[in-house]
């Protein structure tokens, strides 16, 4: 009997530890801004980095030279969305970025979308697969909220080698006016924000020589409850 109780205790402790590890490794969109029991979370594709010329790169010409282009490749750990199953032949490329630094110092570079990319609904998280080169630079997501105000959200440190999924958590506005606002009852009925691109702040010690970075599969987890539960005969405030 004592051995049975000991085994049960060990199994219970292991399951709790595994759950905590999962929670710490990746943000749970269901708990981000969960002020209502009514949610309809959906993971949507924002961009697959398949179109040449749809992304632009910039950095100060005093600090170095930057270039970007598409390459054949894919993260092996990436799981396709349900609507993309069977269409793997349409998702075969990644965006490669190369930076050649002139000297070590406080540098940064931007990876910007050709045009702002809207994401409908109340966005909880934004994720992207990044192939790093084990240099301790920091990546930020650049967004524009419902009122056209620009914000940056920390995605993670690039001190790893190979592919890794980075996730930015979008914290809700506390009062509908401050912070990242995604909806307003006074100015329209379509919640969401726009993704402008990314900024990488370089570690001054490691910003030398050539640096390579690869991006793929930009996604968002968004709450579409308000959009999916509109009455069919409701009027649209878009005039």
Regions found by a protein language model. Name each.
Residues 1-5, 20:
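Short, Lys/Arg-enriched, disordered terminal segments
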Residues 4-14:
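Sec-dependent N-terminal signal peptides
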Residues 15-19:
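Sec/Tat signal peptide C-region and signal peptidase I cleavage site
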Residues 20-239:
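Beta-rich carbohydrate-recognition modules and glycan-binding surfaces
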């Amino acid at each position: 009997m004592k051995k049975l109780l000991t085994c049960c205790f060990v199994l219970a402790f292991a399951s709790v530890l595994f759950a905590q590890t999962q929670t710490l490794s990746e943000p749970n969109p269901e708990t981000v801004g969960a002020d209502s029991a009514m949610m309809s979370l959906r993971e949507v594709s924002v961009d697959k980095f398949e179109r040449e010329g749809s992304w632009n790169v910039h950095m100060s010409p005093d600090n170095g030279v930057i270039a970007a282009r598409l390459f054949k490749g894919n993260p092996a750990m990436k799981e396709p969305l349900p609507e993309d199953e069977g269409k793997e032949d349409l998702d075969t490329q990644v965006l490669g970025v190369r930076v050649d630094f002139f000297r070590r110092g406080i540098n940064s570079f931007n990876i910007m979308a050709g045009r702002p990319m809207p994401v409908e609904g109340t966005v909880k998280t934004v994720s992207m697969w990044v192939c790093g080169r084990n240099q301790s630079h920091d990546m930020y997501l650049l967004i524009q909220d419902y009122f056209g105000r620009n914000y940056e959200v920390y995605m993670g440190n690039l001190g790893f080698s190979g592919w890794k999924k980075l996730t930015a958590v979008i914290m809700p506005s506390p009062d509908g006016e401050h912070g990242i606002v995604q909806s307003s009852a006074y100015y329209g009925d379509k919640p969401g924000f726009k993704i402008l691109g990314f900024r990488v702040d370089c570690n001054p010690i490691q910003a030398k020589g050539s640096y390579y970075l690869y991006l793929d599969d930009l996604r968002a987890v968004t709450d579409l409850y308000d959009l999916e539960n509109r009455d069919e005969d409701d009027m649209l405030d878009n005039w």
